[in-house]
A protein has these predicted regions:
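Alpha-helix-loop-beta-strand connector modules within alpha/beta enzyme cores
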Residues: 71-95, 121, 148-165, 219
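Glycine-rich, proline-tolerant flexible connector loops at the mouths of alpha/beta enzymes
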Residues: 11-14, 35, 64-73, 136
């Protein structure tokens, strides 16, 4: 790819809109409940203020966060629309598959409709986070309550059908085996074969820190 297209990179900033989450994945040290003292949820104005700090130096903003119990698709439509209105040239990569699922449940609409509404608001692409390991037995242990393996793939599939490109990921070093990693990558390879909308694969190691997963391999 480097030889054929040249080196490609983005100048981006990460803005995590909230750490409040209705789930409590065992590997996650980011999540907070609404009652915890260090819980936060940015207003739309606060989000735009964060963009203001970096706007001259970036061409993309990357935003993921917790599953806030009070936010539905309307909130994100308003947030993305406001960001695009002020910074139309900055690409917005936001919302992992489980966030899309959460918004669809909160708003009682399909994955497809959720994604189309977000696209019309100005969403440019989806990050790949949340894939973890695409094995539902493992997911039941490390991230109980998140989207299933098939739901992760289907949400990315629906995004591609809506014209929204996406990334994909793999979290390794929790409790999975090498075989699980290979199966995971094969599932993503098959998804990539369905369209040209899968932009990149990002594997990243588990970092224990303050997580609640003592049996992790730390690979």
């Amino acid at each position: 790819k480097s030889r054929g297209l040249g080196d490609v990179y983005k100048r981006q900033v990460h803005i995590n809109q909230t750490n409040i989450c209705v789930l409590a994945c065992r590997f996650c040290a980011f999540r907070r409940s609404k009652k915890q003292s260090d819980a936060y949820a940015l207003t739309i104005d606060q989000y735009i203020t964060e963009m203001d700090k970096f706007a001259e130096h970036i061409d993309e903003v990357h935003s993921v966060g917790g599953l806030h119990p009070d936010w539905d698709v309307d909130f994100y439509v308003d947030l993305i629309s406001a960001a695009k209105q002020k910074y139309p040239k900055i690409s917005i990569k936001a919302l992992t598959a489980v966030e899309v699922k959460h918004l669809s449940i909160q708003s009682n609409i399909s994955f497809s409709e959720t994604l189309l509404r977000l696209k019309h608001a100005g969403l440019d692409s989806l990050p790949g986070g949340g894939a973890e390991i695409l094995n539902d037995e493992i997911r039941e242990i490390i991230c109980k309550g998140k989207e299933s393996s098939e739901e992760y793939l289907e949400i990315h599939r629906q995004a591609h059908l809506a014209g929204i490109p996406s990334n994909c990921t793999m979290l390794f070093g929790t409790i999975e085996k090498i075989e699980d990693r290979l199966i995971h990558m094969d599932k993503l390879r098959k998804l990539a074969d369905e369209s040209s909308m899968l932009q990149c694969f990002v594997p990243y190691p588990f970092l224990p820190d303050s997580s609640r997963l003592p049996q992790a391999q730390l690979a």
